[in-house]
Amino acid sequence: MAWALLLLTLLTQGTGSWAQSALTQPPFVSGAPGQSVTISCTGTSSDVGDYDHVFWYQKRLSTTSRLLIYNVNTRPSGISDLFSGSKSGNMASLTISGLKSEVEANYHCSLYSSSYTF
């Protein structure tokens, strides 16, 4: 039986002390098991383009947000190498390789760490 794994993304607006920017993500992306998908996060030259402080979070039902990537492409200890981050110009991306059912979740980008207010 063929099935598609749905990965939901959120629109995120950061509001903090050093930037007030609207970051744009697609409403959803999907892929089949084993495939790779990339979620984009588009900003401007004065936010994503200027800074390497892009963070990616995963939010599953009934759990708190989990930091997947910080400073564009760095994974915290314990985060699977299925997740990778990159940036080109005003767009940051999160790539999830080898899709599995356990990565079905909400994903969002931010210019802030979880210690800031979103």
UniProtKB/Swiss-Prot annotation:
Subcellular compartments: Secreted; Cell membrane
Position of the signal peptide: 1-19
Organism lineage: Eukaryota, Metazoa, Chordata, Craniata, Vertebrata
One BP annotation, GO: immune response
Keywords attached to this entry: Adaptive immunity, Cell membrane, Disulfide bond, Immunity, Immunoglobulin, Immunoglobulin domain, Membrane, Secreted, Signal
Region (Complementarity-determining-3): 110-118
Keyword field contains Cell membrane: yes
Disulfide pairings: C41-C109
Record's function text: Probable non-functional open reading frame (ORF) of V region of the variable domain of immunoglobulin light chains. Non-functional ORF generally cannot participate in the synthesis of a productive immunoglobulin chain due to altered V-(D)-J or switch recombination and/or splicing site (at mRNA level) and/or conserved amino acid change (protein level). Immunoglobulins, also known as antibodies, are membrane-bound or secreted glycoproteins produced by B lymphocytes.
Source organism of the structure: Homo sapiens
Domain Ig-like: 34-118
Name by which UniProt lists this protein: Probable non-functional immunoglobulin lambda variable 2-33
Region of interest called Framework-1, as start-end residue ranges on this chain: 20-44
Encoding gene (name): IGLV2-33
Origin superkingdom: Eukaryota
Region of interest (Framework-3), residue spans: 74-109
Region ranges (Complementarity-determining-2): 71-73
InterPro entries, per the entry: Ig-like_dom (IPR007110), Ig-like_dom_sf (IPR036179), Ig-like_fold (IPR013783), Ig_sub (IPR003599), Ig_V-set (IPR013106), IgV_Light_Chain (IPR050150)
Region spans: Complementarity-determining-1: 45-53
The keyword Chaperone is assigned to this record: no
GO cellular component: extracellular region; immunoglobulin complex; plasma membrane
Region (Framework-2): 54-70
